[in-house]
Amino acid sequence: MPSHYYLIIPASGVGVRMHPEKDGLNEQPKQYLKLDNGLTILDQTLKTLLSINQIKSCVIAIKNKDHLFAKSAFNNHPKLLTIVTGGKERMYSVLNALKALIDFAKDDDWVLVHDSVRPCVKASEIINLMKQLKHHATGGLLATKVVDTIKQADNNIINTTIDRSNLWQAQTPQMYRFSVLLKALNTAIKDGINITDETSAIEHLGLESILVKSSKSNIKVTNPEDLILANFYLNQHQK
């Protein structure tokens, strides 16, 4: 029986860097900011990913007392399996979403975890990720090669220049077998490992991840200027 593909969107962040003057606490979460096309960042993200035929269903993790997702155009989407409460950190949000899939996903089914604030990801690149990893035992992620010169510094004083020839910038989706990702996150939490993405948890287990080249346009909207760039890329995608 072929493996199914499930989508997890952790969307419980508050966006401190988007609203530094308010410490991100009293401003609208960045995933609900509007793009030039009239959609919120989250809705644009969902529009792209839920349009992919291979994706069977989706679990979204939102902040406790989040009343904004109820207004989403995708709140009643047929592929939306359930909504879970996000955790204090990303890994807990993803783990809560994985637990919601336990009664649905098989061990070797795929789970794609995608940042809610990466609205410019192309469906074609996600489909290529699925194709490249189809027969892999663990999984992998979209990424781009680092092209800038990278400096390591201490208190703004440069210590060294890092060889960039083998450096990649991790993006999302990050796609792993259901049972592997569930074990990886549980193990990382048990061991007290602070992870910032799913691949970090896989690395902690000592497992292999595959990098699949993506485009620079798959940006994460973190700062105000990123919103301008996201609108530019989305406009270019329509041409």
From Swiss-Prot:
Reactions this protein catalyses: 2-C-methyl-D-erythritol 4-phosphate + CTP + H(+) = 4-CDP-2-C-methyl-D-erythritol + diphosphate
Site (Transition state stabilizer): R17, K30
Keyword Transferase (UniProt): yes
EC numbers: 2.7.7.60
PROSITE patterns: ISPD (PS01295)
Protein origin, superkingdom: Bacteria
Enzyme class: transferase
Pathway: Isoprenoid biosynthesis; isopentenyl diphosphate biosynthesis via DXP pathway; isopentenyl diphosphate from 1-deoxy-D-xylulose 5-phosphate: step 2/6
SUPFAM superfamilies hit by this protein: Nucleotide-diphospho-sugar transferases
Listed GO biological process terms: isopentenyl diphosphate biosynthetic process, methylerythritol 4-phosphate pathway
Pfam family, one: IspD
One term of GO molecular function: 2-C-methyl-D-erythritol 4-phosphate cytidylyltransferase activity
Keywords of this entry: Isoprene biosynthesis, Nucleotidyltransferase, Transferase
Site (Positions MEP for the nucleophilic attack): R164, K220
HAMAP family: IspD
Function: Catalyzes the formation of 4-diphosphocytidyl-2-C-methyl-D-erythritol from CTP and 2-C-methyl-D-erythritol 4-phosphate (MEP).
Family statement: Belongs to the IspD/TarI cytidylyltransferase family. IspD subfamily.
Protein name: 2-C-methyl-D-erythritol 4-phosphate cytidylyltransferase
Upper classification of the organism: Bacteria, Pseudomonadati, Pseudomonadota, Gammaproteobacteria, Candidatus Pseudothioglobaceae
